[in-house]
Amino acid sequence: MLKGKVVLLGVTGGIAAYKAASLCSALVKTNATVEVVMTKNATEFIAPLTFEQLTGNKCLVDTFDRNFVHQVEHISLARRTDLVMIAPATANVCAKLAHGLADDMLTTTVLACKCPKLIAPAMNTGMWENPVTQDNLQTLRHYGWEVIAPDSGRLACGDVGAGKLPEPELLLEHIIRALAMPKDLAGKQVLVTAGATCEALDPVRFITNHSSGKMGFALAKAAMLRGAEVKVICGSTTVAPPPFVEVIKVQSAAQMFEAVREHSREADFVFKAAAVADYTPAEPAAEKMKKKDGALSIPLKRTEDILAWLGANRRPGQVLCGFSMETENVLENSKEKLKKKGVDMICANDLRQAGAGFGVDTNVITLITAEDVRQLPLMSKEAAANAILDRALILAGK
């Protein structure tokens, strides 16, 4: 994912320094080249040898080390670095970076870097909340740093509050968002619907479907990584939503319709990937229905057609994409849906095809527009999401 990218991982002298080893390992698994620079205080918490074994590269600590491969090591490293991540960052290092102090290998190197910079402060709650620290972080933001807020919880000193270094998995997501994708959706707003709706029969039971939300969340994550501001309206899902997107939770088709009406107008791209019930109980029971002998009939009524409403109420320039899950006559039914709903593209799925459908991590999609039909091969839902976004961008440029 990050092959060919050079990440400078700065590690400073806090108890959370041990988490930097897990982050370093995760970065190596993305095929990034990881260069670790430590402060001398950091070496009191974790040995440079740990990072050297993980990365295969020399861990830099001493500005005046005479064993450098390059004559001016901090400048050479700064030139080839694609992204800086300092995690954990002490209050001391935050202050030095905010005011341009360069008195060790880490601050000297980072001062020379012209690439994107991320910093994850970790410290005692009192130090974090100190106005001086907050002023320093605001200065860093002013100069283009992305400041990753600490988590709250029990700290090593025994206090409870803000100051914990976020888990390495979340820090990695920040790095991937900054580096992995072209930012061709920067400045755009994307709305995605995902998951299944649940239509109540009574306070206990409901009608739903097999949608996991994986395809919708893959679209949301891909759009986020490509620079978009993303909102996800989701029903029931079996997986967690991606980070850095706004999540709006709903249950029923009626709730999803109202949420779409509220949030769709501002979107540049709308992807309706949710599996929304076509019918809902006409009158859900107020109390739990009791089991009786014989058959049970439940009157149903049509739900609002969200995609048709979007097609009829779209604003000029908005790109609208729907999904079609079929078991027969896939192309014919999907082409008819494209025309009937007034959308730009239908992503058609054949439920009978191996590797496609609900709950799996792959998909086989046919992209249908007014101009052409494009059959995508079996691929991960993440890859399919990017293929859909590529096509949507072409449609936006028409």
Regions found by a protein language model. Give the residues of each.
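A cross-family phosphate/adenosyl-ligand binding-site feature
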Residues: M1-I119, N124-K398
